[in-house]
Amino acid sequence: LWGAAIALGFAAALTGGFLLMGCPVSLLPPRDYAAGAVLGTVVLQALIAGAEELFFRGFLPQELEALALPPWLTAAVPALLFGGLHFFMNGNVIQLCISTAIAAYYLLLRRKGAGLVTLAWAHLLHNLIFFYLIGI
C-alpha cells in the first residue's frame, strides 16, 4: 500500500510542481504550444508513465495475487482499470481499447520477467508516439 501511495503522491507532486513553475501541462500535442515546453512535457510524461507502471504493473497485481485470486483476474483487473482511467481522461473509445490492450500486454511481459523500468520506457515511448505524433 505504501508503494502505491508514494507513486501516486510523487506523480501528483510533480504535476503540481510543473504547474507552479509555469510549465504548460496540456492535453494538446507539442506542435500546439511553444517548443521549449516539449522537454518539460516529455519529462512529465516519463514521470507519469513510471508512476502508472509502479501502480498498475507493480503494486496492484502483487496485492491481487496476495488475495489468492486466479491469475487471469490479477491481470484483467489492472488492465481494465488502466484502460478505464485513460478513457475517463479523454472519453476516447479508441484510447480505451488501446490502453486496455497495452496494459494486458505489459502485464504479460511483467510476468515473463520484464522490469518496471523497462515497462516505463515502453510506456513513455507509446505515449509519445500515439499521443503526440498520431494525436490519439
Where are these regions (language model features)?
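Juxtamembrane helix-loop-helix connectors linking adjacent transmembrane helices
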Residues: 1-49, 66-67
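Hydrophobic alpha-helical transmembrane segments
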Residues: 1-5, 38-42, 72-77, 96-97, ...
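Small-polar-interrupted transmembrane alpha-helices in polytopic inner-membrane proteins
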Residues: 7-11, 72-86, 103
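Membrane-embedded alpha-helical segments of multi-pass membrane proteins
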Residues: 35-39, 43, 51, 55, ...
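Alpha-helical transmembrane segments of multipass membrane proteins
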Residues: 46, 80-87, 104-108, 128
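Active-site His/Glu-centered metal-binding helix of metallohydrolases
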Residues: 50-55, 59-60, 84, 88, ...
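Membrane-interface helix/loop boundary segments of multi-pass membrane proteins
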Residues: 52-77, 108-115
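Functionally important transmembrane alpha-helices
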Residues: 91-136
